[in-house]
A protein has these predicted regions:
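Bacterial Sec-dependent N-terminal signal peptides
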Residues: 1-25
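Bacterial Sec-exported substrate-binding components of ABC uptake systems
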Residues: 17-101, 209-238, 326, 339, ...
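A short, structured surface patch at a secondary-structure boundary
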Residues: 51, 59-63, 69-151, 156-162
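Solvent-exposed, polar/charged alpha-helical surfaces in well-ordered, non-transmembrane soluble domains
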Residues: 91, 101-105, 148-152, 170, ...
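Short, structured coil segments at secondary-structure junctions
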Residues: 109, 175-176, 263, 326
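Extracytoplasmic substrate-binding proteins
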Residues: 135, 154-246, 270-271, 329, ...
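A ligand-binding cleft/hinge motif common to bilobed small-molecule-binding domains
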Residues: 164-174, 299-312
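Flexible, glycine-rich surface segments
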Residues: 224-309
Length: 375
């Protein structure tokens, strides 16, 4: 009887995994689902010879944005129609965002980046050095990438960001290089977005590094969030400034909107249901935020002069009507010098620490990105 049970176990196990036969067609089984504690748009299921990764469509949540089969070995897999096959580990990738290039640096996989778009936004010294040495090729603008250079780079995957109603990715969809659709920015929470590093770590062959880093981020973030809960002040806060004739503000359910709540700041649009940004006229923001205690903004300074409240007022004559400008409680991040965009999407604990330092000065925390704008 025992021998019969053992034989059945071996038969079932061998059948379900398909062995290591070259060219084996893998039947879809239930697999082992990797539990995501925070990410809502990402599902990862481990099968015998591959991981199945499904990305939910952030704008049509009942539909999938993309499905990947990430092979565990060089064995050939026969994938269903509409599924993208990725052979890991990826050794040659092109990133269309400094966000994901910055993460690959954190995962010690920066040497696998062979090209980037929008190099003028790069701040990380490892990336700048690789560009200088010719190890990373300038792929042009993210909106109009240099297709010839991408092909010449022999990239195994392109890390791109999906947008609602964008109409696709243009010519890069036709060159036969898999597109990794990085929808992490649409996660409603900071830790949800950061948890996507598990997917990117899987692709790059850096799973353990990604798991370890996420555990570190989660622990630090939750510690800071708990500290903020114990503070007494709840300052109101407004965010960013005019871009042309429009004021773009993060929605109340956006990553930043939720993070402001985690810092125990009362965001003026906290009740808004948008997870992305909203485009508002100046008059609307003035009505809603004129009495806000704190004004947070991102700006690009001029090398010739420091950015001051006078500089800010020169950009729009109505800024002096805000209480935060009048009392000098404006805090800015100089994106020309700062690594805010390269670091904070996957190190939200760094950002939360800054917010707590501003909202609760009694914490005596030092700032990493945001500093008081002087007159």
């Amino acid at each position: 009887m025992k021998q019969l049970l053992l034989s059945l176990f071996i038969l079932i196990f061998s059948s379900s995994c398909g062995g290591n036969r070259q060219g084996a067609t893998v039947a879809e089984g239930q697999g082992d689902t990797l539990t995501m504690k925070y990410a809502q748009l990402l599902t990862m299921v481990e099968h015998c010879n591959y991981w199945e990764v499904k990305i939910a469509n952030p704008w049509r949540t009942t539909q999938a944005l993309h499905t990947y089969w990430v092979a565990k070995s060089t064995n050939t897999l026969s994938v269903p129609q509409g599924v993208t096959l990725i052979k890991r580990p990826l050794d040659r990738v092109v990133t269309f965002s400094t966000v994901h290039a910055g993460l690959l640096c954190m995962l010690h996989a920066e040497q696998k980046i062979v090209g980037m778009t929008d190099l003028n936004y790069v701040k990380h010294p490892l990336l700048l050095n690789a560009v200088k040495k010719g190890q990373i090729t300038d792929m042009g603008s993210g909106l109009q990438p240099n297709i010839e250079r991408i092909i010449e780079a022999n990239a195994q995957a392109l890390f791109v960001s999906p947008f609602e109603n964008s109409g696709g990715y243009g010519k890069i969809e036709t060159i036969g290089v898999p597109l990794i659709e990085c929808a992490d920015y649409m996660e409603p929470t900071a830790l949800g977005r950061a948890e996507w590093m598990k997917f990117y770590g899987l692709l790059m062959g850096e799973q353990q590094t990604a798991d370890s880093l996420f555990n570190e981020v989660e622990k630090a973030y939750l510690h800071l969030k708990n500290y903020a809960r114990q503070t007494k002040s709840r300052p109101t806060v407004m965010v960013d400034k005019m871009v042309g004739s429009v004021w773009y503000v993060p929605g109340g359910k956006s990553t930043l909107g939720v993070m402001l709540a985690d810092a125990q700041m009362r965001y003026i649009y906290a009740d808004d249901e948008h997870s992305g940004s909203m485009a508002l006229p100046f008059e609307r923001v003035l009505t809603d935020a004129k009495d806000a205690d704190i004004w947070l903004m991102r700006y690009a300074s001029s090398p010739a002069a420091p950015y001051t409240l006078t500089t800010l007022l020169a950009e729009h004559h109505g800024y002096d009507r805000f209480k935060a400008w009048q009392q000098g409680t404006c805090y800015g991040c100089d994106t020309r010098m700062s690594r805010l965009f390269e670091e904070t999407p996957f190190r939200p604990d760094f950002m939360l620490s800054d917010l707590i330092a501003i909202a609760h000065p009694e914490s005596k925390r030092s700032s990493r990105y945001f500093f008081k704008i002087e007159r």
